[in-house]
Regions:
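Conserved catalytic-core segment of NTP-binding enzymes
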Residues: 49, 119-213
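Rossmann-fold NAD(P)-dependent oxidoreductase module
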Residues: 53
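P-loop/Walker-type NTP enzyme "switch/lid" segment
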Residues: 2-41, 56-139, 148, 159
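Hydrophobic positions on the alpha1 helix immediately C-terminal to the Walker A/P-loop
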Residues: 45-46
């Protein structure tokens, strides 16, 4: 189950540059949000694989699921029914009960129970309290976030993460939609760390390079 959960599904040419950037800047980047312009662009898959690859390099990583509308980590890691991030934020459990060790270097915090998801909000002070505890235990926290164009929870997490990796689905996301979403994220205080153009068969377009620059 564990091996299947983090088996590579993202092209290595996409995964490796992102991993190199995280490792290079790990002294100042301890919490990374992974989000997308719209649903279905591979955010959860990328977040899982980044966390797994980082852990395989001998560094400790925790994968936190803040994508509460489409939770997937509990099933992927065999944690169905276990408490998670929403339970912690709602004050239903102690933080330690929501963190589940997968192996020596990788832990997972799934979304949590449906009842807690309905009650919890990401502007709660418990979010920062929990992530501060995470900073003490792990080298890196990767937060699986909602899409930018949806509920707004990615923007709500901006004060709590050091920056975002944004996934853009190649050949399915219109340029204007992507540009507007990126601008919205920056306006909300989100620091863009980079963009992953997923499922692409073409070079990265010039407008995206300009944004990255």
């Amino acid at each position: 189950m564990i091996a299947a959960a983090i088996a590579p599904k993202i092209d290595r040419a996409i995964l490796e540059p992102a991993l190199v950037q995280l490792t290079r800047h790990e002294s100042r980047v301890r919490r990374v949000g992974v989000t997308a312009v719209q649903p279905g662009e591979g955010v959860s898959t990328l977040a899982r694989e980044l966390a797994g690859a980082y852990a395989r390099r001998g560094r400790s990583a925790v994968l936190v699921e803040a994508n509460w509308s489409r939770p997937s980590l509990a099933e992927a890691f065999g944690l169905t029914g276990q408490p998670g991030f929403a339970d912690i934020v709602a004050g239903a459990v102690a933080p330690s009960r929501g963190v589940h060790a997968i192996d020596d270097n990788l832990s997972v915090v799934p979304a949590g129970s449906p009842s807690a998801i309905r009650k919890a909000t990401l502007d709660d002070g418990r979010v920062e309290d929990f992530l501060a505890l995470v900073d003490d235990r792990f080298d890196l926290a990767i937060v699986d976030c909602e899409p930018i164009t949806e509920i707004g929870d990615a923007a709500a997490l901006s004060p709590f993460v050091d920056g975002f990796i944004v996934v853009i689905g190649a050949e399915r996301t219109r340029r204007a939609v992507a540009q507007r979403a990126l601008a919205d994220l920056k306006a909300a205080g989100g620091a863009p760390l980079g963009v992953v153009l997923n499922r692409t068969r073409r070079p990265i377009p010039k407008w995206l390079y300009r944004w990255l620059g």
